[in-house]
């Protein structure tokens, strides 16, 4: 029975690596996955899912206007699709999350979404908010803070490495702009303690 999965974490937990491994597992068995990624994330090139360890795959892109149900339905009519893998799912809209529930419920195709739970301000991304509410399975992928604790927050830093508390929710970047930290060090970096 198909289900909607949300694999979430802070940055550098291996979300894209896990997605690419899942795609490989399906392909190795002669099955056809659909890989989607956010158009806004062009760090490896538009329409590419790439991991820090060098794995990469082509992907269909989505932006805020893409009807992901229609895309997957069309692809499935051309050739049977066995799963949908969504990278950078935090950038999905509420409507797109609901469309993915329709992919599961109406088309019977499992959907595995991978993304950040919260932004650098400690607030949920829209896609993550609705995946937390609507996913059948929630799976936390873990990474570690510099202190060894589980990192569950992301700090955005400026060119001097100082934490930033304000700004646009979305600013594409990697290790040069973001650091995954535990709650204690997140609060300390932003002077949020007592």
Swiss-Prot record:
Record field: catalytic activity: thymidine + ATP = dTMP + ADP + H(+)
Task: Identify the gene encoding this protein.
Answer: tdk
Cited Gene3D superfamilies: 3.30.60.20, P-loop containing nucleotide triphosphate hydrolases
UniProt lineage: Bacteria, Pseudomonadati, Pseudomonadota, Gammaproteobacteria, Alteromonadales
Provide the protein's localization. Cytoplasm
Q: One GO term of the cellular component aspect?
A: cytosol
A single GO BP term for this record reads: DNA biosynthetic process
Name this protein carries in UniProt: Thymidine kinase
Q: What is its EC number?
A: 2.7.1.21
Q: Report residues binding Zn(2+).
A: 145, 147, 182, 185
- Give the enzyme class: transferase
Subunit structure, briefly? Homotetramer.
Which annotated residues bind ATP? 9-16, 87-90
Active-site feature positions? 88
Keyword terms: ATP-binding, Cytoplasm, DNA synthesis, Kinase, Metal-binding, Nucleotide-binding, Transferase, Zinc
For this protein, the record's Pfam families field holds: TK (PF00265)
Family assignment from sequence similarity? Belongs to the thymidine kinase family.
Taxonomically, which superkingdom? Bacteria
Tell me a Gene Ontology molecular-function term this record carries.
ATP binding
